[in-house]
Amino acid sequence: MRYSQDHKAQTHQRIIKEASARFRRDGIGATGLQPLMKALGLTHGGFYSHFKSKDELVEKALQAAGDEADVVCAELFAQDRPLDAFIDAYLSQRHQTCPDQGCPLPTMSSELGMRGQPSPTSDAVLNARLRQIQNTLEGDDTEKRSIVIMSTLVGALLLSRCVENPELARQILDVTRASLKQSQG
């Protein structure tokens, strides 16, 4: 059965969207192609008419997650206290408990690092956030300070997600949030 180019393009985007959410929620390695395609009502073999490999899908899914983050961050960084708004959103309970809807860096970065080859897409996602943070900072070393802030946010969110004790998870977010805000004056 032949499908129109429009249908194929829509299916392609559905696969990317679902993969993006699953990679952020479950991890790249834990997301199998067969269950991914089955969840979309598609066959495993049909995957290869859309992508050459899982690695290609990973890059496209990471780009889609980055695009989603760009939209959210544009709103946050347009507020009166943009860095505070970003820190609050990044270290929110919602972001902690809904990784499939959040920044891809905490969930995907460790696996991307273990792949053995850097990802230009992860560089782009990270650099977009660093620029936005840096643009809110005053004084010296704004580039270095933006790296410290983003690294702290990603690390705190990742730690809060990996502990079993919900009180400790909340403390990690709260203490990090307060510390980052205090350090900014």
Task: Name each region found by the language model.
Residues 1-10:
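N-terminal intrinsically disordered/low-complexity leader segments
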Residues 14, 18-56:
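Helix-turn-helix
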Residues 51, 58-65, 72:
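Alpha-helical DNA-contacting segments of helix-turn-helix folds
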Residues 55-57, 108, 117:
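A secondary-structure capping/hinge motif
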Residues 60, 71-102:
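Hydrophobic alpha-helical connector segments
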Residues 70, 84, 100-101, 113-139, ...:
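Amphipathic alpha-helical packing segments from all-alpha helical-bundle domains
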Residues 92-95, 105-115:
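Helix-loop "lid/cap" segments that line or gate small-molecule binding pockets
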Residues 104-106, 141-162, 175-179:
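Hydrophobic alpha-helical segments that form the core
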